[in-house]
From Swiss-Prot:
Belongs to the alpha-carbonic anhydrase family. GO terms for molecular function: carbonate dehydratase activity; cyanamide hydratase activity; zinc ion binding. Inhibited by acetazolamide. One of its GO terms (cellular component) is cytoplasm. Residues 238-261 are annotated as: Disordered. It holds the Pfam family Carb_anhydrase. This is Carbonic anhydrase 1. Its cofactor is Zn(2+). Zn(2+) binds at residues 95, 97, 120. Catalyzes the reversible hydration of carbon dioxide. Can hydrate cyanamide to urea. It comes from the Eukaryota. The keyword Cytoplasm applies.
Length: 261
C-alpha cells in the first residue's frame, strides 16, 4: 500500500495528496475528530471480541513512512468479531502513527484533544473476500481498531516491538517478529466509537469501519523517540528520520459516529 509519490512533508504531504488521489476530498475520509456530545449511543452494538493467536505473528518491516508488524492471514486463527460487525475480520497487520513532538502524533482526536501517538490494528473481511488485496477497496472490506496513546509512563507491553526496531532501521528492511498477541496492547476497557471511514494514507480507500477505543494507553517520551529514530531512507543514503506520519482530521460530512457506551 506504499508508493514513493506521497509522504508527510510540505511537498508531498497530506495537503497535496488530492492531486494524485482525488478521493482525499471524499465524503468518508479519516481520521476525524470525535465530538463526544454528538456521538450516538447505539444499543445494537455488541462488545468487541478479539481472538489473536500469537503464532500468526510473522515479521516487522520498515515501509519508509512507518513500520508494519505483519501476520499470517491465510486462515481464521486471529480474528475480530462483534461490535458493529456481522462478519468476522481477519488480523493482517498493526502499525503506529506519531508526530514530530509529543503534543500531537495521533490521527483521530477526541473533542479536539490531540494524543501523542495512535496504534492501528488492521483486519480484512475474510467472510466475504479471499484476500486483503481484494478487500482493501471494498466498502465493507476493512476493520481497523484505533487506540490513542497518551504520553506518560513507559508502556512495557510495547517493549518487544521497540526492541525489534534496531533490525529495521532503514526503508525496506524486514526481520522475523514471532509469538506476539497484539491484544496485549489494547486498553482494559473496550468501550468504543465507530464510524465509516478510510485508510489514512494513500490510496485512501473508503473501505474502513473504524473502532476507536474510548480508553487510551500510555507511551513514554523515550518510547516515542524510538519511533522517530527509524529512517525513511534506504541503507547507504543520507539518514532521514521518520519524524511524523499522521494525517490531520478530515470533515465528517454528515457521517454519524456511534458509541457502544
Amino acid at each position: 500500500m506504499a508508493s514513493p509519490d506521497w509522504g508527510y512533508d510540505d511537498k508531498n504531504g497530506p495537503e497535496q495528496w488530492s492531486k494524485l488521489y482525488p478521493i482525499a476530498n471524499g465524503n468518508n475520509q479519516s481520521p476525524v475528530d470525535i465530538k463526544t456530545s454528538e456521538a450516538k449511543h447505539d444499543t445494537s452494538l455488541k462488545p468487541i471480541s478479539v481472538s489473536y493467536n500469537p503464532a500468526t505473528a510473522k515479521e516487522i518491516i520498515n515501509v519508509g513512512h512507518s513500520f508494519h508488524v505483519n501476520f499470517e492471514d491465510n486462515d481464521n486463527r486471529s480474528v475480530l468479531k462483534g461490535g458493529p460487525f456481522s462478519d468476522s475480520y481477519r488480523l493482517f497487520q498493526f502499525h503506529f502513527h506519531w508526530g514530530s513532538s509529543n503534543e500531537y502524533g495521533s490521527e483521530h482526536t477526541v473533542d479536539g484533544v490531540k494524543y501523542s501517538s495512535e496504534l492501528h490494528i488492521v483486519h480484512w473481511n475474510s467472510a466475504k473476500y479471499s484476500s486483503l488485496a481484494e478487500a482493501v477497496s471494498k466498502a465493507d472490506g476493512l476493520a481497523v481498531i484505533g487506540v490513542l496513546m497518551k504520553v506518560g509512563e513507559a508502556n512495557p507491553k510495547l517493549q518487544k516491538v521497540l526492541d525489534a526496531l534496531h533490525a529495521i532501521k532503514t526503508k525496506g528492511k524486514r526481520a522475523p517478529f514471532t509469538n506476539f498477541d497484539p491484544s496485549t496492547l489494547l486498553p482494559s476497557s473496550l468501550d468504543f466509537w465507530t464510524y465509516s471511514g478510510s485508510l489514512t494514507h494513500p490510496p485512501l480507500y473508503e473501505s474502513v469501519t473504524w473502532i476507536i477505543c474510548k480508553e487510551s494507553i500510555s507511551v513514554s517520551s523515550e518510547q516515542l523517540a524510538q519511533f522517530r529514530s527509524l529512517l525513511s531512507n534506504v541503507e547507504g543514503s543520507n539518514p532521514v528520520p521518520i519524524q511524523r506520519n499522521n494525517r490531520p482530521t478530515q470533515p465528517l460530512k454528515g457521517r454519524t459516529v456511534r458509541a457502544s457506551f
